[in-house]
C-alpha cells in the first residue's frame, strides 16, 4: 500500500517592535536575565495590558503580503495553561476572531509547476519566558515574556519535506522583506512547529496527527518531517496504534522524541480577554498599511528574470534575502554584466559567507567594488582564476580590487610573444605529450596549458595560452 503525508506548519515570528506587546519594556535580544521586565509582563496583580499599536500594524502588513483577508473586528483571548515560563498562567492570544485569515503562499515544485499552500489564519499573541536547564535545577528568564508574535497557521496542503522547507523559506523571505520580523531562526525570532499525519494514497480521511517541535533550521525541518513520516508508515504497517501527541526533534540523534499527548483546544479553556477592547480596523487604515509594502521577493525575482535576463533559479536564490537582492541589483547595474554579478554572489562570495557564518550585509566590500572586479576580468586585465584570489582578499580586507591587483602584481599577461616563448619551452620539455597527442590523447592539451599557467603563476591570459598550445602542438603532430 502506498502512503502520502499531510503536512501543515505553525510558524511563530517575533515582531520587530522596540517594545513589548502590552508594556513599554524593550524587546532587545541578549540582555541579562530578568532585566527587561515590569509588573505587566510578569503578570503581577493589578497590572493592566495596553496593546502596542505597532503590533497591529505589523500583523496587518504580514496578512496583506500573504494574500489574507483582514478581519475588520477581531478580539483578544486568554489561553489558560500552567507552566513555569507563563507568569500569568494564561497567554493573551486570539482564538475565534484572528486578525487575518484565508491567505496563501505559492511555492514551486521540482517539475516547475506552482502549488498554492493555504494560510488558515494569522493571529497576534505574546511570547512566553524561557527555561534554562542546569544541573542545579531549572531557571526562568522572563525577558522574552510579552515579546509580540504573530502565529501563521498554514492549511495541511504540503505533502513532502521539501515542500514544507520551501514554504518556510518563502514565508521567511516575505516577512523579512516587509521588515515586520528579522526572522533569525538562530535567535528564536522565527520558530516552526510541524503537524504531520499519514494516510493511504487517495484517501480523504486524515490520519492521526503528531506535532513536532524544536526545529531551528530549514534542514532540521526537512529531516524531522521525513523521519516522522517514516515512523508513522512503519507503525501503520505493523498494525500498531498511533497516538496524537507532541514530539520534539532531537538534532543530535536525528529522531523525534515523545513529549506529551497532544492537547485539544478545549484543554486551554479559551475565553475573551476582559482587560482589552476589541481590535477594530477600517478600510482607510488597511490601505495606509498596504501602501508601505515594498516589492515582495517573488515579484523582485520575476523582475530580475525580465530585466536582467538571468535564469529563474538564479533570481529565486538571489531574492531569498533583500540584502542579497539589493547587492546583486546594484552590482549588475554598475558592471553591466548581470550574469557575472549573479555568478560571483551565488558562487565564491556565498561560499565565503557560509564558511564564516556571515550575512551579505556584513561584507567588507560593496557593489561598486564587486563591479570593479567584474570589469577587470571582462577587460582582460586579470583572469577569472586571479579574480577568485582577488575576491578572497576583498572579503578579508575590504580593499578595492584595483589596489589588490597593483599591490600583488596580478595584472594578466596578454603579450602573445612572451607567452609563446613559454609555450615552446614547455612543449620542448615534454616530448611525450606530443607523442600522446598523436595517439589520440587530447587530454594532454589541458596538461600543457596547466604547466604554462603554473610557469606564469596564473598571469598568462588563458585564452591566448589555449590558442598557442593548440597551434604549436598541431604543428608538431
Swiss-Prot record:
Its EC number is 6.3.5.-. GO terms for biological process: glutaminyl-tRNAGln biosynthesis via transamidation; translation. Keywords: ATP-binding, Ligase, Nucleotide-binding, Protein biosynthesis. GO terms for molecular function: asparaginyl-tRNA synthase (glutamine-hydrolyzing) activity; ATP binding; glutaminyl-tRNA synthase (glutamine-hydrolyzing) activity. SMART domains: GatB_Yqey. InterPro entries: Asn/Gln-tRNA_amidoTrfase_suB/E, Asn/Gln-tRNA_Trfase_suB/E_cat, Asn/Gln_amidotransferase, Asn/Gln_tRNA_amidoTrase-B-like, GatB, GatB_C_1, GatB_Yqey_C_2, Gln-tRNA_amidoTrfase_suB_CS. It comes from the Bacteria. Pfam families: GatB_N (PF02934), GatB_Yqey (PF02637). It catalyses: L-glutamyl-tRNA(Gln) + L-glutamine + ATP + H2O = L-glutaminyl-tRNA(Gln) + L-glutamate + ADP + phosphate + H(+); L-aspartyl-tRNA(Asn) + L-glutamine + ATP + H2O = L-asparaginyl-tRNA(Asn) + L-glutamate + ADP + phosphate + 2 H(+). HAMAP family: GatB. Heterotrimer of A, B and C subunits. Allows the formation of correctly charged Asn-tRNA(Asn) or Gln-tRNA(Gln) through the transamidation of misacylated Asp-tRNA(Asn) or Glu-tRNA(Gln) in organisms which lack either or both of asparaginyl-tRNA or glutaminyl-tRNA synthetases. The reaction takes place in the presence of glutamine and ATP through an activated phospho-Asp-tRNA(Asn) or phospho-Glu-tRNA(Gln). Belongs to the GatB/GatE family. GatB subfamily. This is Aspartyl/glutamyl-tRNA(Asn/Gln) amidotransferase subunit B.
Amino acid at each position: 500500500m502506498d502512503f502520502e503525508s499531510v503536512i501543515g506548519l505553525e510558524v511563530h515570528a517575533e515582531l520587530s517592535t522596540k517594545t513589548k506587546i502590552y508594556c513599554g519594556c524593550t524587546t532587545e535580544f541578549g540582555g541579562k536575565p530578568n532585566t527587561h521586565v515590569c509588573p505587566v509582563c510578569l503578570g503581577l496583580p493589578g497590572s493592566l495590558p495596553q496593546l502596542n499599536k505597532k503590533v497591529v500594524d505589523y500583523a496587518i502588513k504580514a496578512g496583506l503580503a500573504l494574500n489574507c483577508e483582514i478581519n475588520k473586528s477581531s478580539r483578544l483571548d486568554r489561553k489558560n495553561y500552567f507552566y513555569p515560563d507563563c507568569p500569568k498562567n494564561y497567554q493573551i492570544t486570539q482564538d475565534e476572531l484572528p486578525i487575518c485569515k484565508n491567505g496563501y503562499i505559492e511555492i514551486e515544485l521540482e517539475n516547475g509547476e506552482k502549488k498554492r499552500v493555504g494560510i488558515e489564519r494569522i493571529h497576534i499573541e505574546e511570547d512566553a519566558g524561557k527555561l534554562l536547564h542546569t544541573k542545579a535545577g531549572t531557571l526562568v528568564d522572563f525577558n522574552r515574556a510579552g515579546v509580540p508574535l504573530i502565529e501563521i497557521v498554514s492549511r495541511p496542503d504540503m505533502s513532502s519535506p521539501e515542500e514544507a522547507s520551501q514554504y518556510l523559506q518563502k514565508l521567511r523571505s516575505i516577512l523579512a522583506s516587509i521588515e515586520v520580523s528579522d526572522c533569525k531562526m538562530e535567535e528564536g525570532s522565527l520558530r516552526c512547529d510541524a503537524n504531520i499525519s499519514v494516510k493511504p494514497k487517495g484517501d480523504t480521511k486524515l490520519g492521526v496527527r503528531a506535532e513536532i517541535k524544536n526545529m531551528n533550521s530549514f534542514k532540521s525541518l526537512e529531516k524531522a518531517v521525513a523521519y516522522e513520516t517514516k515512523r508513522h508508515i512503519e507503525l501503520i504497517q505493523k498494525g500498531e496504534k498511533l497516538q496524537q501527541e507532541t514530539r520534539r526533534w532531537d538534532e543530535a540523534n536525528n529522531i523525534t522524541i515523545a513529549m506529551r499527548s497532544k492537547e485539544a483546544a478545549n484543554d486551554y479553556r479559551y475565553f475573551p480577554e476582559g482587560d482589552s477592547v476589541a481590535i477594530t480596523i477600517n478600510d482607510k487604515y488597511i490601505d495606509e498599511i498596504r501602501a508601505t509594502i515594498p516589492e515582495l521577493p517573488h515579484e523582485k525575482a520575476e523582475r530580475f528574470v525580465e530585466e536582467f535576463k538571468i535564469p529563474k533559479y538564479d533570481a529565486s536564490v538571489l531574492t531569498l534575502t533583500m540584502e542579497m537582492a539589493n547587492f546583486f541589483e546594484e552590482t549588475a547595474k554598475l558592471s553591466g554584466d548581470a550574469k557575472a554579478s549573479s555568478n560571483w554572489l551565488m558562487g565564491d562570495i556565498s561560499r565565503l559567507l557560509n564558511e564564516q557564518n556571515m550575512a551579505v550585509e556584513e561584507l567588507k566590500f560593496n557593489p561598486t567594488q564587486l563591479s570593479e572586479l567584474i570589469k577587470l576580468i571582462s577587460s582582460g586585465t586579470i583572469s577569472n582564476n586571479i579574480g577568485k584570489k582577488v575576491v578572497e582578499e576583498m572579503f578579508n580586507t575590504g580593499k578595492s580590487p584595483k589596489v589588490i591587483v597593483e599591490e600583488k602584481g596580478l595584472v594578466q599577461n596578454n603579450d602573445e610573444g612572451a607567452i609563446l616563448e613559454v609555450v615552446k619551452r614547455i612543449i620542448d620539455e615534454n616530448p611525450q605529450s606530443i607523442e600522446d597527442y598523436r595517439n589520440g590523447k587530447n587530454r594532454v592539451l589541458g596538461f600543457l596549458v596547466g604547466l604554462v599557467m603554473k610557469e606564469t603563476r596564473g598571469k598568462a591570459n588563458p585564452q591566448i595560452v589555449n590558442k598557442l598550445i593548440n597551434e604549436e602542438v598541431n604543428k608538431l603532430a
